[in-house]
């Protein structure tokens, strides 16, 4: 157990920070130390908080490239260059978005009615981090915790714990150097379901990013929770749409980090008048349309017993085709299966965190909406859907 002492303006803080959190007792001790640190952090001024927020965001942004490389190397998923962008967004863009936001003391006052709104931290945040976006999610959650004077305990995914903890350490060290209390950011060294559940029970707020089971557990914990679960994004291409723009946008979205962004398109629903044109544009831009027998092979590869096959997550199209026993050009961008059913019994109708798309031909616009609604419902309402349409021409 390390004993840390730091001078922060008029504050003298002594925090006993356990070196690790590998079992329930150690986690409990680490949370006690964090509560002590957070009680001091809650007294900081806006000026002190903003200095810490800036230093932490700057440090995370400067480490965006090595952290991206570490995440890909550890998980075997995704694209280094795209993870660099995600880390950049989670640090510099988040800083620029919230740098002028007041989070301490009186943040709003209505003198006419005698009302003041005062910002107060909630306490300790439990942050559940996914394997798909480990470093960027850890950076983002740690930064918003610092900006709001909360402590944050991170539970990494077991397959991404090294890179997740590395990102958290960078943010913590920069924050402490800028004046934050020791132990204000922590993590579970060897995450287990037991420790994650214990963390959710002990925390004051849960930020859960992950699969449906995890998000449901967070919502059922009895604590306030904000969940980011799976999506099943449909994209409708209307017959008035700019076809090249629509196809290029979908390809860019679906190939970014090998399709691991949960808001990326999972299905394309096309109106009959432009179906052949859309198909031709996808093929022209390097996508591969699977033949009927190849569709069946890919079906069996992307889903196993109704669940997404972990072996395809974050892999490129060529690798997935190889796993399925399908021969495609090595530079293939996306594997596209033309299917009819939107039922969950159709493997292509599920969320696929990889460059594999379902493509549907709608009878008309109403049919396209019906198909899209069914896909969104199966993936979870309140997530993402997109529509490519020229509304002026439609009118």
Mark where each language-model region is.
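N-terminal Rossmann-like NAD(P)+-binding subdomain of aldehyde/semialdehyde dehydrogenases
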Residues: 2-116, 144, 284
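ALDH superfamily catalytic-core signature
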Residues: 9, 14, 21-23, 139-140, ...
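Short, flexible turn/loop "capping" segments at secondary-structure junctions
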Residues: 30-32, 227-229, 257-262, 346-353, ...
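Conserved C-terminal structural/oligomerization subdomain of aldehyde/semialdehyde dehydrogenase
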Residues: 42, 326-395
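Rossmann-like NAD(P) dinucleotide-binding subdomain of oxidoreductase/dehydrogenase enzymes
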Residues: 106-245
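Residue-level signal for inorganic ion chemistry
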Residues: 149, 206, 271, 320, ...
